[in-house]
């Protein structure tokens, strides 16, 4: 085709399953239509009338909600096992024969991030080999095994090993759960459903803080980690009964299974719409399958580095993920109880619950506005709030710690107005973080083409956890070396750099199909092209409404004329 060089794909029509004469006929017609609109003179015109009308009327089915909730159990385990360490570090006391120093606390915290990095980088290839849902089950095994090692720990080294094993599950959950949800979700609800994963993560963190309050006694931290085994075992037990992602089924030639899942996901939609949707997906997956057969894992990784349509989504995903971590949020998740203990609060774990609760609440806010407002707009609106919260927190630390050489010294009674301001500004920072970066980061795997989506999910999560290691392994050291004011000011500066990156390198994916997102990176970072396609969608939708209104009006006029004649 004349446009093949623009897209790097061949649009040969794939073979079709025996789906009955009616559906097969619809698929024949739909595929021809899809090939026509998939390679237009204007690459932004990607939808025919059936898809344009259908995607705006897609319904959220119980089946899809159930799949999202199932996958989000991994997110709950992720959140619980990263949040539980905050209270555990305070309650361990001398259970290992001595009081933990700051270096040991950093190693225990960072071990999970190290394991998560390995889990994230390996889980993408595993998901492409055994499937999305079974990779989540592998993550459950890591969650369970890690918790058992931790619960039986009687040394710092064993604790670190257990936390690293736990991290393998965290990395797997971070990479694959949002990928699975995005691939089963209707286009209209994809952003909101992926946010269910974020709600589960923050809910797990909040729950870990809640149970940390009563379990502060001797060996209470062992019970805290043991509780985290329960959701992992439950998810692993039911995974067999759930469907695979339709995209993965098609990649493995399970076309009837893929169509059955599409039918259940789009229940209530017309057969014509489902046929067009399936044909479009089938074609893109066929192209991806051809690609996968001709490329090894190493070759794919080289393509990410050398070919623009893969490199640019990788830069976008890595940038969003790295800035999410380097902003310092997880320093609060891991060390909130430690910070508030040093700041003189009587019950630091309870105060940490305010931080975690804020994060959870505003994750719900994000879910309600994500697809309506748009992910890019939300990020550009919330990053300034994050910067302001961190900058004012650094001012509060400066005023608060004047009597101790601008260092936090445990056991010091600091001025209440400044400690309260510090807490308030942390809450402001977290509110903006949870509404934007905390949620949207886990959706940017959708920016990768299907043939690279498993690798892309690993790249994203790998970048996130590499940056997380930097934060978790240096926070207490930074606080001791330069003090809290410069530390939080540094995080504010990193957020400013993140805001600039988002403005130039993050296109708006909301309202675009996963297949459309592949096209926009043929035009730089796709910021302007995404805007054009979305505007074109709105224009076409308005034209369709105008035609419908004109038809209704014409019918009404005809009826009036007939009535007048009578």
From Swiss-Prot:
Polar residues: compositionally biased ranges: 556-566
Cytoplasmic topology ranges: 1-64, 128-140, 185-192, 244-313, 371-377, 443-458, 507-566
Gene Ontology molecular function, alphabetical: myo-inositol:proton symporter activity
Phenotype on disruption: Simultaneous disruption of INO1 lowers hyphal density and leads to a severe sporulation defect and attenuated virulence in a murine inhalation model of systemic infection. Simultaneous disruption of ITR1A results in defective mating hyphae, reduces production of phosphatidylinositol and glucuronoxylomannan, reduces laccase activity, and increases expression of ITR1, ITR2, ITR3, ITR3A, ITR3B, ITR5 and ITR6.
PROSITE patterns: MFS, SUGAR_TRANSPORT_1, SUGAR_TRANSPORT_2
Transmembrane portions of the chain: 65-85, 107-127, 141-161, 164-184, 193-213, 223-243, 314-334, 350-370, 378-398, 422-442, 459-479, 486-506
Catalytic reaction annotation: myo-inositol(out) + H(+)(out) = myo-inositol(in) + H(+)(in)
Any single GO CC term annotated in Swiss-Prot or TrEMBL for this entry: plasma membrane
Membrane topology: Multi-pass membrane protein
One of the protein's GO biological processes: myo-inositol import across plasma membrane
Role, per record: Major transporter for myo-inositol. Plays a role in the traversal of the host blood-brain barrier.
Family per record: Belongs to the major facilitator superfamily. Sugar transporter (TC 2.A.1.1) family.
Name of the molecule in the record: Myo-inositol transporter 1A
Species of provenance: Cryptococcus neoformans var. grubii serotype A (strain H99 / ATCC 208821 / CBS 10515 / FGSC 9487) (Filobasidiella neoformans var. grubii)
Lineage: Eukaryota, Fungi, Dikarya, Basidiomycota, Agaricomycotina
